[in-house]
Amino acid sequence: MASSINGRKPSEIFKAQALLYKHIYAFIDSMSLKWAVGMNIPNIIHNHGKPISLSNLVSILQVPSSKIGNVRRLMRYLAHNGFFEIITKEEESYALTVASELLVRGSDLCLAPMVECVLDPTLSGSYHELKKWIYEEDLTLFGVTLGSGFWDFLDKNPEYNTSFNDAMASDSKLINLALRDCDFVFDGLESIVDVGGGTGTTAKIICETFPKLKCIVFDRPQVVENLSGSNNLTYVGGDMFTSIPNADAVLLKYILHNWTDKDCLRILKKCKEAVTNDGKRGKVTIIDMVINEKKDENQVTQIKLLMDVNMACLNGKERNEEEWKKLFIEAGFQHYKISPLTGFLSLIEIYP
């Protein structure tokens, strides 16, 4: 009969140990991915036009001969995680997968800027101070580590601000892909304001698809001050907590998850004012996550819960349907509709 420790079988204990070690060393997942992007490996393989051999790869990378084995080990681990495919014929070679295709710079859909922004020590390094942050009454995690709120930090650090805007723009391109089958969102509209629209990545796609639709990108003055619009696209600087330009619809893409419930109510009330001006009854369209642990696949739930912890560090949150509903009612909206998008996002339309 197998022995037990504290009532646990050795097999249970070793399984638990494996789980612990997986999470203890999970930072290597992120850092090896950052290494591949920093070494431009996805582009090297893409430009090669076919699977690239280890010898060709290290020749292009110009690494010392003593590190060739380390390159192979990193590539093997990245392949195990789904970022490359190992082809074994005469010599071990590497091909892109769908995941690493999303890291090819210059492609229509490239998330390399997201990797660089999130895994910069400015952001990722802050998580070493979770214990200190949890005892602070009002400070965000970044307030603890950076000495100011995240948005204030961006204003004072133009280099990282550029990295952040590039990351958001790269993510917007994938959201735009999800919106391709959502023409109904824009049907019947004459105008829409993209609140927190950054450099206008999403707005430009909307304008191209609906050339008669007037689109306003509304963001902080320092974000939009040097940007040029077009016939149906304009940039307006301002503060969404003070006022939002009037339009038939307001778009909030990845905005509300950054803020507390109290701040979200302030934003939503300003949105309501913007879409009900002059007796009109427009709508507010939200693109964000809706947590549903009962119905979502485990991997989707994990992404949403990861993002929820990430947003908590900004004093924001990801929300389930009941939490969204409570916000909408308190902000004075009458009804809402949730449409799942491809991936882990949902499209929420709310009506005054």
Swiss-Prot record:
UniProt keyword list: Methyltransferase, S-adenosyl-L-methionine, Transferase
User: Where substrate is bound, by residue?
Assistant: V118, L119, D120, P121, T122, L123, S124, G125, S126, Y127
The entry lists its GO molecular-function terms as:
isoflavone 7-O-methyltransferase activity; protein dimerization activity
The record's Pfam families line, in alphabetical order, gives: Dimerisation, Methyltransf_2
Query: Top enzyme class of this protein?
Result: transferase
Write out the residues that bind S-adenosyl-L-methionine: G196, D219, D239, M240, K253
Q: Name one GO biological process term.
A: methylation
Name the catalytic site residues: H257 (proton acceptor)
Provide the E.C. number(s) assigned to this enzyme. 2.1.1.150
In which pathway is this protein known to take part?
A: Phytoalexin biosynthesis; medicarpin biosynthesis
Instruction: Return the similarity comment.
Output: Belongs to the class I-like SAM-binding methyltransferase superfamily. Cation-independent O-methyltransferase family. COMT subfamily.
**In UniProt terms, what function does this protein have?**
Transfers a methyl group to 7-hydroxyls of the isoflavones daidzein, genistein and 6,7,4'-trihydroxyisoflavone. Can also methylate (+)6a-hydroxymaackiain with lower efficiency.
PANTHER family listed in its UniProt record: O-METHYLTRANSFERASE
Q: How does it assemble?
A: Homodimer.
Protein name according to UniProt: Isoflavone-7-O-methyltransferase 9
Q: Which organism is it from?
A: Medicago sativa (Alfalfa)
